[in-house]
């Protein structure tokens, strides 16, 4: 555990080292607090002794001293709390940002394989425990140093009482250690269960509309009830274990307190211990009897800290959470040419979606992909954006292998407008600024005009400052897609991918969007996935996909002649 703890504290220090002077001041405050904790009972005992001897003048001076000690203790407690909060806040913020950045760099296959709860719990709960480690150590260091001072004072007063306290510490320490080991194992299971429940609740909240429309409330609530019962059962099991040990240990404390009182009475009756020193020991006993708790709680929290650190290490360093890999080649400008050269890919090893797929796209051209669902149209877009990596073959942008290009050369030059675009829970203006923070109001207005969104925005009381809700919940499907199109126009990337982006639009708006796409042809390389063939008949080329291959490539008129599958789809659409 020591080796693991050393590694984890070194990791936490990376995020706390800028607050090192506050940490030093916190340790100094702790040191003074220890002195006060040891001295205060001595002064209190003297007050009682002097009062019993009617030495009122000395009592007055001692009372003033005790008052000053208490004031000093309050000030030091305040400073300790202040420094602790600053250190925690700064460490927590930096750690969360760093972990958030790491999560954004994970491969999509890793995101797909884990529930959102895995990342939410670690990003919130585990980071909090790591950020608080130095405050925990300092807090318990205060207790431990105070206990050492108290035990030293008791040793000077009477070695027999000291020996008794050591025996008491060993017995309670053994029980505390057993409790920590049992609770830590149960906590591992509880955290995993909590991740599963958090992920399911996230799905429930995001899919609440579909759940209502499908009348699936009962099924979801039944599943939620089952998972919550399982979680609460594990939570209760861990809590019961803690209570059982607390009952045993608390009862032992009471027995030990009774024994120490009997022991002191015996020593006083034999004139081997003065009443004044007995009062001092009694004042110390409240701390001394629970001395082992400080060490045990420190050990328990450090084990929790190690557990949280290891869970975060899994995301940052473990091969179980693979990161996206980019090359070092940077393109200052992208023309928009790209090529798929014998590319194969599957979301799992058993089944390939694309099989030796090859095609070339020239810059400033409009290419459409057509085919049945599941033939790999969206997969082509995902591979081009490097959301996934091909199993075999190469993807080239302007003649450079995508594996050699850096992140900016790919992601800053390709925009995908999906069938269900995610709209952030901010204003319309801020949604557009997400992709380009220095965008001007004129650019925003122009992008919304091209995307046929300007009339709708003008009808809103707050206009561009209207907050659209999580996922754009206050917008219709068509409005969300048009906002996504405006967002792509603001970004001004050279390659724009439309993945069924006009599927939720009415015919009038679809015509306007089609005109907007036609206006963009001279400046952009445009790729379109569409089931409505009427939206892509003016494309420069149409690629018909089947079973992971391109089986036909040409204009609309050419495909009607050479591709029976395309002709059949087009005739079926005309009949509708």
Predicted segments — roles?
Residues 216, 240, 254, 288-315:
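Cytosolic ends of transmembrane helices, especially the final helix of ABC transmembrane type-1 domains
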